[in-house]
Amino acid sequence: VERSVADAPSTLNFILPEAFLGEEDEERIAAIRENMYAALENDALSKLTRGFVFTERTTRTGTRRGIVAAIDLEAYSSEAGVSAPIRSSEEVVPERLAPRIAERKNAPLEFPHAILFYRDKKDRAVKMLLREELEKLYDFDLMEGGGHVTGWFVPEDLAAETAQLLHAKGEPVFAVADGNHSVAAAKAHWESVRATLKKEELANHPARFMLAELVNLYDASVVFYPIHRLLKEVDAEAFCDFFMKNVRCRREGTVLIPSLPAGAEGVKKTDELCERFVRENGGTIDYVHGAKELARRAAEEDCAGVQLAAMDKEDFFPALKGGVNLPKKTFSLGEAKEKRYYLEGREISYD
């Protein structure tokens, strides 16, 4: 990606890629901050008035439509057992937050990639926006086989009308589909800023909000894929015997297909057994996308796999009720190139 971008203007200059976390973070974050201030000073960014961005992204699974808007971090929680209008969908690991919090500290801008689900079976919000004559902001092919993306500006009055259609009954109203640690880091940063503010400054401070893409869970392009478990550096026969003593399975070579419920319950049971075996016998656990890839890697020496079923999207919101977090790696929304690219940004400080 760096070779492709070279010296061209790119949001790559404003982000800390996950692949680089833990590698010279301070130097990278300082460079990101400098790039942001330079872009602001040189008028390299197009500033919009208040509103939303309506996006249409074409990938191999179809066309995904989303609404890019600022969410109120006061309404968000990742704490277990805490009900909130905006919920994390999996447990947040504190150690993974530090570099992301540091990235936001003293930064004038954010360029997030988080996707949040909402529920709208009739797709009223998207259908309303499709009927409008909106100003087109961008329309181009994405790099690295990411498909095509188009964005339109939704002015403030229409944005307010659209927002009313996004609120389904019951909590959570929104749940993080991708970017759990990014949203949690934004909340942690806001809490540190909030502690320094006067009461009258709390309601509208830019750090209180975070930009995210809101996607209808019932969009036809939203597909939940399972994430399989791969055991490495283990006695494959011993692992298979151990797992099959605890769960009824079909066995295909060194791949086990357990008779467990799809989704959180099956993942939790699988993880408990895999972690117990590794704790008692050594080895490591890896996460693999695709049944064929799992079979290929499980056939390698000292490896074994557990093939899981895909979570039903209808079970997603009910599983989070009451502040419950899903086990890590419960589902995937597809390959890396199908995830959200970094496009829109927002000011998060008054500097």
Regions found by a protein language model. Give the residues of each.
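Surface-exposed, charge/polar-rich loops and edge strands
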Residues: V1-D351
